[in-house]
């Protein structure tokens, strides 16, 4: 067996070697290149097909030979550089190929031009065979150069870079290509033979009908092929930019290019070499540059190697002394292109060229021809234009390579470097040419490598010896300060020993020490200057125009004499405006280009202006305060290649006054929505979707409207070739985005996969599913919202299509606009007045008073507002600009609706709520109809005759009622005056005539007047109408539901669907059956067969029955009926309750609202006749009380006394008791019952007496709902809204609710154990209460012995109790359960354990203890549950509302006190998170430690107070800082102490040390309400923590009035913090005294801008747009009051978005609308110094062993002073668990050395110099014993050796100073990456063991 496997393995490896060999790969690639068919194949195929005879054979041979020779030359040119250069020169082949194509075309079409006249058959004399050979050869060569071939032909070139044996690969690939072509030619020959021999083709009708077709085809074949060739060439040439007809770009102002021409570094030289070459065409096109430039560059022809730069000032020559030398540049060409160097050119390489003014103004014909025709650096290739972030920079050239290859020494070996400085390589080449070859000796590779190894080993040994000496001195007891290597610093004064400041010390900071306008790293900023370092500096825009910020800017002033006169002109012009308006520079009349004259640079105003530019003291124009200069460090960045011109998109034209645009962006139209006619008004609008067009007289606010068509332009630069773009398609007529066909499978489903597989399966298994179907409650809310969404999408698409059709058809907008205006005038002045006249004439004819005034008032109220094409309102008279071209809409405000009569304005509350959403506007269509949205479907207009018909029906009904009264009087008279002889026929006629009208109404009226008069009649009528009555009750239930939904339309926005009706129909079938059974029983008992005859005879039979039956029979019948009903009622009700209520609770997030709340209560009435007496009968309290879903808890005695089975009858929970408890409930929770209490109809479950008693204040109570902050969600059903009102549900995680699936819910939630704590005796009153709705069996008595019996039960179910006990806290002082509409809540309710285990909270992991500790002895089922539901242990980000204010100290994050042990009982403080949506308490174990620190640690390294903004939609990406923590937390939930994520303490740390015996509240002066609660919690007694119950916070919503007071406290705190009165800030530095509130706001806001990015809330975008639309109209109206009120009522305008104050501050703005600004932190890479990065790494990765085991041995609190080093060492000390001595430094012995030598030492020992193969590959983790010789003897370290080894590994892994940014810097310099992926290429090695050699 072993032998077989061995042989098999050898065989596989052999096969792999063969497959991967160069020969096989070459053959494969060569064979693939066979299929790269290009134009050269046309000649080959023509020779094969057309040539016959002897000459034809020779031509075939010559064609094949030429073809193969050409391909062989191409393969050889890959390997042989001279041939590649000859064929690959940019313009050689192109220039030669074009004339050859022309010659070939004429040769084939006009052969007599070239015919010698000889008819000899000598083929040598005839040039045709040679021409065939040349054609095939040359076209094979051209195929790769002038005619782009397919990708297959380039595969060989690609693989060449990977292959070592290149010649073998080229040979094998050519052989493969040859084999492929031989097969191809054979196949073509076989096909031709088959065509010739196949009789069916030859006998074709077409061929037979034309005898000469074949011969003519053969004769013209040459011409056909030449035409094909020409078409092919034209097509291929079309994909190459036309050399002459390309778009010429205009160059930007030269001042913007000074940054590129001024650079000196090698990297910059490389960049500038790539950015040149674009100016020739500009100089050609503009012939002469009209603007004298400050700096300009002179370029030579691009086919020369050397490109030098020069600087010109006003045409005067600068001397070498005035300028530094400019290093020469090298064109981005291969290194081996040295054969073109001319020796004379090298003399100019290091010279500054003399000024040559004529070169600047060369005419186009003076340029070289090749340069004129071909400039490969143009925007000809369809590249994307990447816009610069700031306007002062130009676009990045992303197609140029940033690499330059050259050989260099690296690690002692000569390697190819791909980022070698080009200037250095040229310099080396020049030096080598100048020096004779005899003087240069080249060392061998081995000698170089050995020398390099030797020197490095010497350095390493020296360092190692010094290092070990220092360590030994430390072990011998020397002072640490003596052992540590000192850092060299500069002194100011040697006698006083004062050092230079850290900022200016070159030994600390490197060579560049100017105060550069960047951010400093906090590690080298003194504590006092930290406040200044975060000042936001706004760059003056004029300064940015003049001086690009590409290079370092120092504080010393520039030499002003070196300025060009351009700046002089510029300053002179600006000077005029500074005199006119010193605060605002009005640049409208400013020209940057002077025409004549010079400026006296010594003028006083100009000097001021120069000071303004060069000193850069920016003043605030409002209060003239001078902002401080900020300090920072220049970031190291590579200069990227940029274009020499800046392109403009067409939407930017308005901003920058550019008349042209060079980028073809998406089609858009500027829609001007507001015009300000004030001259020279200074308007600036900072809204994102506004564009400002500053014309000379008007300021216009415009919106950009994009068409909905696909964007085929795709930001292509004008002049670039569209054919080279990736192909894009659309599938629909109007599709917003085009897609490439490559990705269609990801976007659209293929047609053959479009059918729904799940739907098919449903159809197949439908019958089987019906059999096994249980009663399920479909989620109608979600279905309905989904249907609505889809319907809205469909309508939106239809509207867009119509709009686009109007927008694309020629002259359609003109026609539509005229039609709309015509319809508007026709409607307003013809149709509506004529309708008013006709109506009032009709009223007068019908003797009604006319309503002229009311109708005319409504008619005058209708306004026809002209709108833009998108619906932005302008005014009634003002038309949009270019409305005939861009389109117009006409919006009708308060559209006139003709009414038959006008009602008075008194309306009830319910009707008002129903009409809330009626829109009072519409848009006019072309056909004169009304529509809600532009291009929407026409809406129904209210009918004029409908109210008339309704009124007629009412009148008829009244008339019937009068007839009923007449009939009643007649009947009474017949009984009283029976002696009157009324004829029988007369009575019959009266009764018949009235009964004929409506027999039902008669019976009801008679029953109301005298129930006993026609009692028999009623019974008879009941027999035939009972079923109908029952149906009407059921239907009444449905109507009741839908009416409730309509009434509460503003918060439940859906109605009953047909699906729900079908669902309910099944459920009512059983009711109907039982009702029919009751009816049949009644018929048998009380009715005789002859009774049931006809409605006419029913009255006589009823009389006969009444006379026969006695009263006791009637009572007996009634009792029997009730008894029968009760039996069915109880049986059915128990069944329904068991199924329906439980399923509703199981599927809480999906439960249908009306079904649970109403229908379960109305099921009672489905059996009860609509009769109040029956309800009273049911409501009698003589039956047993039930306990409904754990709301009413039984006492112990009641449990022990009850032994009978308890029926869960809902009716025994009397309504009086329910309403009594509701009256005790807080007002805030009563709006759940609004629909019940405010229902005006007959309530099917609520007694009128109770409702009238309780509903006395229903309207007043529910008026509170209007003030409730949390608006209801339109998609929620009533059950969810009912739960939303309970704060237990509101703040429960969806993860928890998802646990409530049927079986688990039954086992875990309802079978919870409840322990009642009465009189603090925990061991006496423990009991287990089972849910009554699940188990109906007897309840046992769990009294004193329940502790022992239920031990495992407690353990098993305890954590599920916490679901409703710990985490869910009501806002009053007591607990209430999860199902708890708070009818009854127990006080002092606790959960006790049989032994005092730490109380497990829901957030188990947040205390740093893994879940496994809990699962050891608990049930295994729960472990499986956690495995199946991994989200159980993860933190739910969407529930908590973060309250970022002041930040806690860093130690609070690390040193989380873990008060959890199996032998100690601990309690929990409740810290409060206050949000705008309400309050809830989150239980956490947390101790704030006393600390003497002055500064707060803010959590992510930000020493700022963060604004208290609630984040409702909190996603992990929202806070970039959280992403790292969130991902780490997902992998290891125990790693991060999450308390800092949950709780952010709002006070100063100093007050926490007041937890002394006196328990006084000192603290901060500005502690808000929740901070005071924190103080209360901190000051509570420790004994009080022994109780595991809820801590009484004593301040709930009632104490604080409402939520507004809480929010006002927040705002007060924000204001106080903004005003600079924060005590923490005052302790560190004195705050600046601001002159006014605005400046303080602005100052702190600008500081905050460094830390946060502002963005608009997504949900508010549409609101803002709607507001803009309304504002545009209101600004134009003289009296906008009515329109404004109407817009607010319609919801078009949000008052909270209108800034109404003049001097609006940030705080007030945030008060006005909470949620407009979402302030989210951005990455603070600039401020992250070494300590912070160190802490981040350790805080995530270091896990103290107490995080894994609940052990209190190492629990201690450290008090840390203010120094960074001590702070860090103490922090690490805490993690190690060392309490006495600080041995932190010994963990990393390298810390003895200075940082610079430390890095050197580290790199040297990292290199395993002797055993290297290319790259060092050391093990990822080193041996754990690497540092043990220093650490084994230490007895004070952590006792856990394994933990220490892990710690050492981590410490050795990091840089000793944790300066991870060093890696980024090394990476940047070594690998020259500038794309942000700093760590993408570097390999970090672990440090090997220290060795002594």
UniProtKB/Swiss-Prot annotation:
Transmembrane segments: 18-38, 63-83, 87-107, 127-147, 175-195, 224-244, 1126-1146
One Pfam family in the UniProt entry: Ycf1
Gene: TIC214
Lineage: Eukaryota, Viridiplantae, Streptophyta, Embryophyta, Tracheophyta
Protein name as it appears in the record: Protein TIC 214
Subcellular location: Plastid, Chloroplast inner membrane
Region (Disordered): 249-317
Primary location group: plastid
One term under GO cellular component: chloroplast inner membrane
A biological-process GO annotation: protein transport
Family: Belongs to the TIC214 family.
Domain of life: Eukaryota
Regions of compositional bias (Basic and acidic residues) in chain numbering: 249-258, 268-287
Function recorded in the entry: Involved in protein precursor import into chloroplasts. May be part of an intermediate translocation complex acting as a protein-conducting channel at the inner envelope.
Keywords: Chloroplast, Membrane, Plastid, Plastid inner membrane, Protein transport, Transmembrane, Transmembrane helix, Transport
InterPro entries the UniProt entry points to: TIC214
């Amino acid at each position: 067996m072993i032998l077989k496997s061995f042989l098999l393995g050898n065989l596989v490896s052999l096969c792999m070697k063969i497959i991967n060999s160069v020969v096989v790969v070459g053959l494969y690639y060569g064979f693939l290149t066979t299929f790269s068919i290009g134009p050269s194949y046309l000649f080959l195929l023509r020779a094969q097909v057309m040539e016959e005879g002897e000459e034809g054979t020779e031509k075939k041979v010559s064609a094949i030979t030429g073809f193969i020779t050409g391909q062989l030359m191409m393969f050889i040119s890959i390997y042989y550089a001279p041939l590649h250069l000859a064929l690959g020169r940019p313009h050689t082949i192109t220039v030669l190929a074009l004339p050859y194509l022309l010659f070939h075309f004429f040769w084939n079409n006009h052969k007599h031009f070239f015919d010698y006249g000889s008819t000899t058959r000598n083929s040598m004399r005839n040039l045709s065979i040679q021409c065939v050979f040349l054609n095939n050869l040359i076209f094979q060569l051209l195929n790769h150069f002038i005619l782009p071939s397919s990708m297959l032909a380039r595969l060989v070139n690609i693989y060449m870079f990977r292959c070592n044996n290149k010649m073998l690969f080229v040979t094998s690939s050519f052989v493969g290509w040859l084999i492929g072509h031989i097969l191809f030619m054979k196949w073509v020959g076989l096909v031709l033979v088959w065509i010739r021999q196949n009789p069916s083709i030859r006998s074709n009708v077409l061929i037979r009908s034309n005898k000469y077709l074949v011969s003519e085809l053969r004769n013209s074949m040459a011409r056909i092929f030449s035409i094909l060739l020409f078409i092919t060439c034209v097509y291929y040439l079309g994909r190459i930019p036309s050399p002459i007809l390309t778009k010429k770009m205009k160059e930007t102002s030269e001042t913007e290019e000074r940054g590129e021409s001024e650079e000196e570094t090698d990297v910059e030289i490389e960049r500038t070499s790539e950015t040149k070459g674009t100016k020739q065409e500009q100089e050609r096109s503009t012939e002469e540059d009209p603007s004298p430039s400050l700096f300009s560059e002179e370029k030579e022809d691009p086919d020369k190697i050397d490109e030098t730069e020069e600087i010109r000032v006003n045409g005067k020559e600068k001397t070498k002394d005035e300028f530094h030398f400019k290093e020469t540049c090298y064109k981005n060409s291969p290194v081996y292109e040295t054969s073109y160097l001319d020796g004379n050119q090298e003399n100019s390489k290091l010279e500054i060229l003399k000024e040559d003014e004529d070169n600047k103004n060369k005419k186009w014909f003076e340029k070289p021809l090749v340069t004129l025709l071909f400039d490969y650096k143009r925007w000809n290739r369809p590249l994307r234009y990447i816009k610069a972030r700031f306007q002062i920079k130009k676009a990045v050239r992303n197609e140029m390579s940033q690499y330059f290859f050259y050989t260099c020494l690296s690690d002692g070996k000569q390697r190819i470097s791909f980022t070698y400085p080009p200037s250095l390589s040229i310099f080396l080449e020049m030096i080598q040419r100048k020096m004779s070859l005899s003087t240069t000796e080249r060392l061998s590779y081995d000698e170089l490598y050995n020398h390099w190894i030797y020197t490095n080993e010497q350095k390493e040994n020296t360092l190692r010896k010094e290092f070990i000496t220092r360590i030994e001195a430390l072990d011998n007891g020397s002072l640490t300060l003596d052992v540590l290597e000192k850092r060299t610093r500069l002194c100011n004064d040697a006698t006083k020993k004062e050092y230079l400041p850290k900022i200016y010390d070159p030994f600390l900071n490197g060579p560049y020490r100017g105060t550069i306008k960047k951010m400093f790293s906090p590690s080298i900023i003194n504590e006092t200057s930290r406040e200044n370092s975060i000042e936001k500096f706004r760059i003056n825009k004029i300064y940015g125009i003049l001086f690009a910020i590409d290079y370092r800017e120092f504080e010393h002033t520039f030499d002003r004499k070196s300025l060009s006169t351009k700046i002089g002109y510029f300053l002179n012009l600006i000077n005029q405006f500074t005199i006119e308006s010193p605060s605002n520079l009005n640049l409208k009349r400013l020209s940057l280009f002077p025409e004549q004259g010079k400026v006296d640079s010594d003028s006083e105003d100009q000097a001021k202006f120069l000071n303004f530019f060069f000193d850069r003291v920016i003043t605030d124009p409002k209060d003239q305060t001078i902002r401080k200069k900020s300090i920072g460090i220049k970031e190291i960045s590579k200069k990227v290649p940029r274009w020499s011109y800046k392109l403009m998109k067409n939407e930017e034209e308005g901003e920058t006054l550019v008349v042209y645009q060079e980028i073809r962006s998406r089609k858009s139209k500027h829609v001007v929505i507001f015009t300000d006619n004030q001259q020279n008004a200074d308007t600036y609008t900072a809204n994102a979707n506004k564009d400002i067009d500053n014309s000379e007289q008007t300021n216009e606010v415009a919106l950009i409207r994009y068409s909905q068509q696909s964007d085929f332009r795709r930001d292509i630069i004008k002049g670039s070739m569209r054919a080279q773009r990736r192909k894009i398609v659309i599938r629909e007529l109007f599709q917003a985005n085009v897609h490439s066909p490559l990705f269609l499978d990801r976007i659209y489903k293929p047609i053959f996969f479009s059918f729904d597989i799940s739907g098919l399966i449903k159809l197949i298994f439908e019958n089987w599913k019906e059999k096994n179907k249980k009663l399920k409650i479909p989620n109608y809310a979600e279905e309905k919202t989904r249907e609505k969404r889809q319907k809205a999408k469909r309508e939106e698409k239809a509207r867009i299509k119509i709009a686009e059709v109007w927008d694309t058809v020629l002259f359609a907008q003109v026609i539509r606009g005229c039609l709309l205006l015509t319809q508007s005038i026709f409607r307003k002045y013809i149709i509506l007045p004529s309708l008013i006249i006709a109506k009032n004439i009709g009223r007068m004819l019908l003797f009604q008073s006319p309503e002229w005034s009311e109708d005319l008032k409504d008619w005058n109220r209708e306004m026809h507002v002209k709108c833009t094409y998108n619906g932005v309102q302008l005014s009634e008279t003002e038309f949009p600009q270019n409305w005939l071209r861009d389109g117009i809409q006409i919006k009708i405000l308060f559209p006139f609706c003709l009414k038959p009569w006008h009602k008075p304005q008194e309306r009830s509350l319910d009707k008002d709520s129903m009409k809330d959403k009626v829109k009072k506007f519409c848009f006019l269509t072309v056909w004169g109809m009304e529509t809600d949205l532009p291009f929407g479907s026409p809406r129904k207009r209210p009918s004029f005759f409908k109210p008339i018909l309704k009124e007629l029906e009412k009148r008829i009904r009244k008339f019937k009622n009068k007839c009923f009264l007449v009939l009643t009087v007649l009947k009474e008279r017949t009984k009283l005056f029976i002696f009157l002889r009324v004829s029988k026929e007369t009575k019959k006629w009266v009764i018949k005539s009235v009964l004929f009208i409506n027999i039902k109404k008669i019976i009801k009226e008679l029953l109301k007047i005298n129930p006993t008069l026609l009692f028999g009649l009623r019974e008879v009528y009941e027999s035939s109408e009972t079923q109908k009555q029952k149906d009407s009750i059921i239907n009444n239930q449905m109507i009741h539901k839908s009416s409730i939904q309509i009434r509460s339309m503003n918060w439940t926005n859906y109605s009953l669907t047909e699906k729900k009706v079908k669902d309910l129909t099944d459920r009512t079938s059983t009711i109907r059956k039982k009702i029919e059974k009751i009816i049949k029983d009644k018929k048998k008992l009380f009715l005789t067969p002859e009774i049931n005859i006809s409605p006419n005879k029913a009255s006589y039979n009823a009389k006969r029955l009444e006379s026969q039956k006695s009263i006791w029979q009637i009572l007996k019948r009634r009792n029997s009926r009730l008894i029968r009903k009760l039996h069915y009622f109880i049986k059915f009700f128990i069944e329904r309750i068991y199924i329906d209520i439980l399923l509703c609770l199981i599927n809480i997030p999906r439960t249908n609202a009306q079904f649970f709340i109403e229908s379960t209560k109305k099921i009672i009435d489905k059996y009860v006749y609509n009769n109040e007496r029956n309800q009273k009968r049911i409501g009698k309290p003589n039956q047993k009380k039930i306990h409904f879903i754990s709301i009413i808890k039984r006492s112990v005695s009641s449990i022990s006394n009850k032994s009978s089975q308890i029926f869960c009858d809902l009716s025994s929970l009397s309504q009086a008791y329910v309403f009594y408890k509701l009256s005790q409930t807080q007002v805030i929770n009563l709006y759940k019952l609004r629909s019940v209490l405010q229902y005006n109809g007959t309530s099917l479950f609520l007694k009128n007496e109770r409702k009238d008693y309780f509903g006395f204040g229903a309207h007043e109570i529910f008026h509170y709902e209007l003030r409730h902050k949390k608006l209801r969600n339109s998609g929620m059903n009533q059950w969810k809204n009912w739960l939303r009102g309970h704060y237990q549900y509101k703040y429960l995680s969806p993860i928890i609710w998802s646990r409530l699936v049927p079986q688990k819910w039954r086992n875990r939630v309802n079978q919870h154990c409840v322990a009642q704590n009465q009189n603090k005796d925990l061991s006496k009153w423990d009991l287990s209460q089972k849910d009554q709705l699940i188990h109906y069996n007897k309840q046992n008595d769990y009294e004193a012995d329940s502790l022992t019996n239920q031990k495992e039960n407690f353990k098993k179910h305890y954590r599920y109790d916490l679901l409703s006990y710990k985490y869910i806290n009501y806002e009053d002082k007591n607990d209430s359960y999860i199902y708890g509409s708070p009818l009854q809540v127990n006080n002092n309710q606790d959960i006790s354990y049989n032994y005092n285990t730490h109380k497990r909270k829901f957030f188990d992991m947040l205390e740093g203890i893994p879940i496994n500790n809990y699962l050891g002895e608990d049930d295994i089922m729960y472990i499986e549950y956690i495995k199946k539901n991994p989200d159980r242990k993860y933190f739910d980000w969407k529930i908590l509302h973060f309250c970022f204010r002041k930040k806690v100290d860093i130690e609070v994050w690390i040193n989380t006190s873990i008060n959890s042990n199996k032998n100690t009982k601990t309690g929990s403080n409740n810290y409060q998170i206050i949000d705008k949506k309400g309050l809830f308490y989150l239980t956490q174990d947390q101790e704030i430690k006393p600390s003497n620190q002055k500064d707060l640690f803010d959590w992510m390294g930000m020493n700022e107070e963060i604004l208290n903004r609630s984040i409702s939609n909190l996603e992990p990406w929202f806070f970039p800082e959280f992403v790292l923590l969130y991902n780490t937390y997902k992998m290891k939930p125990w790693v991060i102490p999450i308390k800092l994520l949950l709780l952010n303490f709002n006070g100063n740390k100093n007050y926490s040390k007041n937890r002394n015996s006196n328990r006084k509240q000192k603290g901060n002066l500005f502690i808000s309400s929740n901070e005071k609660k924190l103080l209360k919690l901190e000051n509570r007694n420790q004994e009080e923590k022994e109780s595991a119950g809820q801590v009484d916070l004593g301040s709930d919503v009632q104490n604080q009035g409402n939520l507004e007071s809480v929010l006002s406290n927040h705002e007060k705190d924000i204001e106080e913090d903004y005003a600079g009165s924060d005590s923490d800030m005052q302790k560190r530095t004195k705050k600046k005294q601001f002159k006014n509130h605005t400046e303080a706001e602005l100052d702190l806001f600008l500081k905050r801008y460094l830390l946060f990015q502002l963005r608009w809330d997504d949900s508010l975008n549409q609101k803002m747009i709607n507001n803009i639309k309304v504002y545009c109209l209101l600004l134009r109206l003289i009296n906008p009051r009515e329109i404004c009120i109407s817009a607010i009522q319609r919801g078009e305008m949000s008052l909270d978005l209108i800034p109404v104050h003049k001097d609006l501050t940030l705080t007030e703005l945030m008060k006005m609308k909470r949620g407009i600004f979402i302030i989210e932190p951005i990455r603070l890479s600039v401020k992250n110094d070494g300590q912070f990065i160190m802490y981040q790494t350790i805080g995530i990765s270091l896990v103290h062993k107490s995080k894994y085991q609940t052990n209190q041995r190492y629990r201690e609190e450290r008090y840390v002073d203010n120094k960074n080093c001590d702070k860090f060492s103490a922090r690490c000390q805490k993690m190690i668990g060392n309490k006495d001595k600080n041995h932190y430094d010994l963990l990393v012995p390298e810390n003895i050395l200075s940082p610079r030598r430390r890095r050197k030492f580290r790199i040297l020992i990292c290199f395993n110099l002797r055993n290297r193969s290319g790259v060092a590959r050391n093990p990822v983790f080193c041996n754990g014993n690497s540092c043990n010789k220093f650490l084994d003897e230490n007895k004070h370290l952590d006792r856990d050796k394994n933990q220490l080894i892990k710690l050492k590994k981590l410490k050795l892994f990091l840089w000793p100073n944790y300066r991870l940014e060093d890696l980024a810097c090394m990476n940047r310099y070594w690998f020259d990456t500038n794309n942000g992926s700093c760590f993408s290429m570097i390999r970090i090695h672990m440090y090997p063991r220290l060795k002594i050699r």
